[in-house]
């Protein structure tokens, strides 16, 4: 981690309802490429005396001309609250969520089975065959 990178937080808010702290993050990195999110998470963890696994940063945009990037960050009180409140795609980026993948053939067969029935019966057919 380089010392020429400065991280500032503003619009800091403690959201007690969702057990998290949320803020706008400003990263100053003059003459350097955009700082990786992992590095930002580590620096925020030091600033707020917590672990990087409960910190979620996203939505970073580098300003024209470079040197300044702004984004959004959330620090959860625990990992359980994060798993409960964060969207699945953000959890997947941290390796906390794995989407079960059905094969293409299974998806097509299910779709074609559902085409044969109408109304509320679709839910029964979509759930799978009864044995």
UniProtKB/Swiss-Prot annotation:
Compositional bias annotation for Basic and acidic residues: 90-100
Sites bearing Phosphothreonine, chain numbering: 9
GO molecular function list: structural constituent of ribosome
Pfam families per UniProt: Ribosomal_S24e
Location(s) in or outside the cell: Cytoplasm; Nucleus, Nucleolus
The keyword Cytoplasm appears for this protein: yes
Gene Ontology biological process terms, A to Z: ribosomal small subunit biogenesis; translation
Any Gene Ontology CC annotation: small-subunit processome
Family annotation (InterPro entries): eRP_eS24_sf, Ribosomal_eS24, Ribosomal_eS24_CS, Ribosomal_uL23/eL15/eS24_sf
Subunit description: Component of the small ribosomal subunit. Part of the small subunit (SSU) processome, composed of more than 70 proteins and the RNA chaperone small nucleolar RNA (snoRNA) U3.
Listed name of the protein: Small ribosomal subunit protein eS24
Organism: Macaca fascicularis
């Amino acid at each position: 981690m380089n010392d020429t990178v400065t991280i500032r937080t503003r619009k800091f808010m403690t959201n007690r309802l969702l057990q998290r702290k949320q803020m706008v993050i400003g990263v100053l990195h003059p003459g350097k490429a955009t700082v990786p999110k992992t590095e930002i998470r580590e620096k925020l963890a030091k600033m707020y005396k917590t672990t990087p696994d409960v910190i979620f940063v996203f939505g970073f945009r580098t300003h024209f001309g470079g040197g300044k990037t702004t984004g959004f960050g959330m620090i959860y009180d625990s990992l359980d609250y994060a798993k409960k409140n964060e969207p699945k795609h953000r959890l997947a980026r941290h390796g906390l969520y794995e989407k079960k993948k059905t094969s293409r053939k299974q998806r097509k067969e299910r779709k074609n089975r559902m085409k044969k029935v109408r109304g509320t019966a679709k839910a029964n057919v979509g759930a799978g065959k009864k044995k």
